[in-house]
UniProtKB/Swiss-Prot annotation:
Keywords: Elongation factor, Mitochondrion, Phosphoprotein, Protein biosynthesis, Transit peptide. The gene is Tsfm. This is Elongation factor Ts, mitochondrial. One of its GO terms (biological process) is regulation of mitochondrial translation. The modification N6-succinyllysine is found at K75, K132, K191. GO terms for cellular component: mitochondrion; nucleoplasm.
Length: 324
């Protein structure tokens, strides 16, 4: 702007030519200014940078470096960023290994006759509330669901299974991600900078005549996580239902709520004598929502038979978890 201003007020000698003629004939080649292509190129680069930043969530510095490395190719730059983040994640994971991971989330996912519970741990509650961590839990749940659905059906009765940390790590990630769950774990560690563990998963699959009730306590939900329900406690309750029951979903939810609150160790029988507050069998326990009756007394008129359950508590001791 100062250059243009100085050109406007430059004194012109009276040589017989007009000032207009002098100004339109720059005496120095470097005074010629072309605005079109360079500005257009800069705008295009900025647009690519913004697009890559929005798509990947990585810093502007890293996105700019990726575009420069890949010659402005958006897809190659995205792949390059993921590979670099994964390398950094594995490096951070090695450094952070051994740090306590008592926080985290339980994830519940149900699709038709199949339900899964997963637990992913981190170091702080702050990170557990981060969307990137919650997306990792989602990938673990989706990977477990795909694993369960690929198993051979047992048509006559329900099936239930568990996956430990090593088994979970080897599962393929969800349908919109590449690699295994341990690759997704490395990416999350690289982004969030905390030690994390894919602790465990449980899955249940039922045929016709059975139903899976579920409940998660301390619910955290995000529209971007679709049908995934997150919390600090979770339960699946397998019921046999020979007839169609109108309020089956509500009954299943209440049974799951009881399992979370009363922490039974076994189902027990309707004929069992109640053992009071220390009772660990589910059916003889005082019903959580009405302690004046046992859970068995609540269940019997509902027309369902409780046959099994799974309970997860985030951060609980591994020996306790194995016993349950």
């Amino acid at each position: 702007m100062s250059l243009l201003r100085s050109l406007r007020f430059f004194p012109v000698a009276c040589t017989g030519r007009s000032a207009r003629a002098v100004l339109l004939q720059p005496s120095q080649p470097w005074l010629t200014f072309h605005a079109g292509p360079s500005l257009s190129s800069a705008a295009s680069s900025k647009e690519l940078l913004m697009k890559l930043r929005r798509k990947t969530g990585y810093s502007f510095v890293n996105c700019k470096k990726a575009l420069e490395t890949c010659g402005g190719d958006l897809k190659q730059a995205e792949d390059w960023l993921h590979k670099q983040a994964q390398k950094e994640g594995w490096s951070k994971a090695a450094k952070l290994h051994g740090r306590k991971t008592k926080e985290g989330l339980i994830g519940l996912l149900q699709e038709g006759n199949t339900a899964v519970l997963v637990e992913v741990n981190c170091e702080t509650d702050f990170v557990s509330r981060n969307l990137k961590f919650q997306q990792l839990v989602q990938q673990v749940a989706l990977g477990t669901m795909a694993h369960c659905q690929n198993l051979t059906d047992r048509l006559s009765t329900y099936s239930k299974g568990f996956l430990n940390s090593s088994e979970l790590s080897e599962l393929a990630a969800g349908p919109d991600r590449e690699g295994s769950l341990k690759d997704q774990l490395a990416l999350a560690i690289g982004k969030l900078g905390e030690n994390m563990i894919l602790k465990r998963a449980a899955w249940v699959k039922v045929p016709s005549g059975f139903y899976v009730g579920s409940y998660v306590h301390g619910v955290t939900q995000s529209p971007s996580l679709q049908n995934l329900v997150l919390g600090k406690y979770g339960a699946l309750v397998i019921c046999e239902t020979p007839e169609q029951i109108a309020n089956l979903e509500e009954v299943g939810r209440r049974l799951g709520q009881h399992v979370v609150g009363m922490a039974p160790l076994s189902v027990g029988s309707l004929d069992d004598e109640p053992g009071g507050e220390t009772e660990t069998r589910m059916l003889p326990q005082p019903y959580l929502l009405d302690p004046s009756i046992t859970l068995g007394q609540y269940v019997q008129p509902q027309g369902v038979t409780v046959v099994d359950f799974v309970r997860f508590e985030c951060g609980e001791d591994e020996q306790v978890a194995e016993a349950e």
